[in-house]
Regions:
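Electrostatic cytochrome c docking/interface patches
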Residues: 24-58
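Processing junctions and N-termini across compartments
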Residues: 14, 57-60, 101
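The canonical Cys-X-X-Cys-His
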Residues: 55, 59-69, 121-125
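Bacterial N-terminal signal peptides
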Residues: 6-15
Length: 132
């Protein structure tokens, strides 16, 4: 008779564990993951952090209304770009997300911005992580 409650508890724990392993990690969206070849792209301006100022100008015009500015980060509309979830991504992945957007998350595509300015924007996003 004592074995039944222990067995039921063990089965319940196993079921919870199995269900947890099937859930995607919080904060990730598998439908918005940069393809490997795009994620592997290197920022041609990575060795020129002074170009982040150009990215800041682009950010002020196109991104700050949702993502906030350097003093007032992330609004309720969009994630904090200085946060770990964004900063852990490769430059290529960030560039791909800027370029392609995500309509499911109300992130517009900024592929119309010239490529050099999008790479400068990636530099600026990186600088936001440095300020934490």
């Amino acid at each position: 008779m004592r074995r039944l409650p222990s067995l039921l508890l063990l089965l319940a724990l196993a079921a919870v564990s199995a269900a947890a392993q099937q859930l995607p990690q919080q904060g990730t969206d598998p439908s918005w993951t940069a393809p490997e070849k795009d994620a592997a792209r290197k920022n041609p301006f990575a060795s020129k952090p002074e170009l982040a100022a150009g990215g800041q100008r682009v950010f002020s015009r196109t991104c700050a209304s949702c993502h906030g500015d350097a003093e007032h980060r992330a609004t309720s509309k969009a994630p904090d770009l200085g946060g770990e979830a964004v900063q852990a991504q490769s430059d290529g992945a960030i560039f791909w997300k800027i370029t392609n957007g995500n309509t499911k998350k109300a992130m517009p595509s900024w592929g119309s911005i010239p490529e050099p300015q999008r790479w400068q924007l990636v530099l600026y996003v990186r600088s936001l992580g440095d300020k934490k």
